Amino acid sequence: MNVVQQTFAELSIGEPEKRVEGRVYSVSGPVVVGCNMIGCAMYELVKVGSEGLAGEIIKIDKDQATIQVYEDTSGLCVGDTIVRTGLPLCAELGPGLFESIYDGIQRPLREIRESSGGIFIPKGVNIPALDREREYEFVPAVSAGDYVVGGDVFGKVYENSLIETKILVPPKKSGKVAFIACRGNYTLKDVVMELETGKGKEEMFMYHTWPVRIPRPIEEKKNATHPLFTGQRILDSLFPCVQGGTTAIPGAFGCGKTVISQSLSKYSNSDAIVYVGCGERGNEMSEVLMEFPKLTVGGKDDSIMKRTVLVANTSNMPVAAREASIYTGITISEYLRDQGMNVSMMADSTSRWAEALREISGRLAEMPADSGYPAYLGAKLAFFYERAGSVVCLGSPRRTGSVTIVGAVSPPGGDFSDPVTSATLGIVQVFWGLDKKLAQRKHFPSINWNLSYSKYFSNLEPYYEEVDPGFIVNRTKCREILQLDDDLSEIVQLVGKNALSETEKLILDISKLIKEDFLQQNGYSRYDNYCPFTKTRLMLRNIILYFDNSKNAITNYKLSWSTIRKETEDVFYGLMKMKFVMADKEMEPKLNKLKREIEGVFLKMLG
């Protein structure tokens, strides 16, 4: 880390006008080799050609530098100029991020459309990521004479009705406050604070920049103990993730990865969402832009877009920018985390990012590893996922925040032995494996309950004990029933259902009830698109209560399963209808009433 920071500090050495211009030596797709580049640094941002195409130095050899260009390189000639900026690729962080849609290197797409009038991004366009003309009401939080350090909150602005943005001192900056602006309306161009540092006075604005490849510093990482509620019953009950966790969603084409990612964006208990469309179809980002403004948060009239940042790097955009889009997204997420928010970042899909790495690696003639991917694929993925976590933020007042990363993986043909999937599974703690067969049977979410897993149960046990002590037992029994059903399915195919014992017949029918009326969920219906955790645990409680009573009647009272089913037909039908109960104030009384009916039926039947 120290070497990276030192390199970053050294990038600014030398005045821009004194730097020697480089020249284009060769062009191969998005990879450009420049000569006469003595003094340049790794990951320095450069402008290539007369149109000023943005690029980043990824390899240095004597006076030659290899540059990956984030725009279309057609039309570049040998001998064209390369202008060094002396800075790494940075993200602009401040008020105005929400409700925006950016490309992979944080250029605002709406503003580009308005300025150019076309539907494609012009070459060399240079529009700031944050609107410099928009006014915000600034409320100072420090006074002149106070000493501040990196991460301290020195003011706040109300960005919209959902978000209050804290204005932070950039990390690595500190000093005595010489001037602080009074409460009032300011733009991002206005100086709102001046610091007296060892090098003289330094002006502070409401925004600052940060290199996308360097993780933002924190006070300390802490153990994540609060669940990330998704509104999907199978995820919240059987395979939960924590706020600050890492999750992979691998699945073949058409299995529903994007729908799950979008459901998380719409309904999860996160304060902010950063949705990165990396190399996926443009229609998916269009869907998000069309649907999200209509959705509201927590029953209020506020659009869900007010807490969402979109980074769109679709499949028809330059390949090199895919790599940058993931880093841009995680840097924005870390900045929002430093505000004290719980942030969810959706990366859809990391496979396309890995394919971009493979293409660049091939152009550099690096030694390929498995399936042509570079040997450092695992290290790059690990570095990205390690930026997730629940943390104590830098500076004062004390704040805690988290970044949860949900990475969709698109293995070719749904093959989970694909190098990207294998490398991802070695890093993440939660695996939501999508099954093509379930998707073909129209069972959605098509998450395979036998393959998927979560390693966060021990972290979440204290939370579950506090909310519902019986939930852990019910969940374990549910997993056992599904596992036994999987074992019995082969026997049924061989000898038929009649050869099974009464308990085994019960297990088959209850597992069918669990799969069709608990795990299956219609994401496009009003009653089932979102299921709160209270409804999830009460539904599971009622199913397991019915199972336990039925098993007791078979074991101790020697009743047949067909007799029990006939006698309890009404409550069994009630269990099947539970998912149609709307998530309102009548929900708990209705599900508790069904519980009492189940207990009453068995009490009457068994005397």
Swiss-Prot record:
It is found in: Vacuole membrane. Belongs to the ATPase alpha/beta chains family. Gene3D superfamilies: 2.40.30.20, 2.40.50.100, Bovine Mitochondrial F1-atpase, Atp Synthase Beta Chain, Chain D, domain 3, P-loop containing nucleotide triphosphate hydrolases. Catalytic subunit of the V1 complex of vacuolar(H+)-ATPase (V-ATPase), a multisubunit enzyme composed of a peripheral complex (V1) that hydrolyzes ATP and a membrane integral complex (V0) that translocates protons. V-ATPase is responsible for acidifying and maintaining the pH of intracellular compartments. Its main location: membrane. V-ATPase is a heteromultimeric enzyme composed of a peripheral catalytic V1 complex (components A to H) attached to an integral membrane V0 proton pore complex (components: a, c, c', c'', d, e, f and VOA1). Signal peptide: none annotated. One of its GO terms (biological process) is ATP metabolic process. It catalyses: ATP + H2O + 4 H(+)(in) = ADP + phosphate + 5 H(+)(out). It is an enzyme of class 7 (translocase). It is a peripheral membrane protein. It comes from Encephalitozoon cuniculi (strain GB-M1). One of its GO terms (cellular component) is vacuolar proton-transporting V-type ATPase, V1 domain. GO terms for molecular function: ATP binding; ATP hydrolysis activity; proton-transporting ATPase activity, rotational mechanism. This is V-type proton ATPase catalytic subunit A. InterPro entries: ATP-synt_VA_C, ATP-synth_a_Xtn, ATP_synth_asu-like_sf, ATPase_a/bsu_AS, ATPase_F1/V1/A1_a/bsu_N, ATPase_F1/V1/A1_a/bsu_N_sf, ATPase_F1/V1/A1_a/bsu_nucl-bd, ATPase_F1/V1_b/a_C. Its EC number is 7.1.2.2. ATP binds at G251, A252, F253, G254, C255, G256, K257, T258.
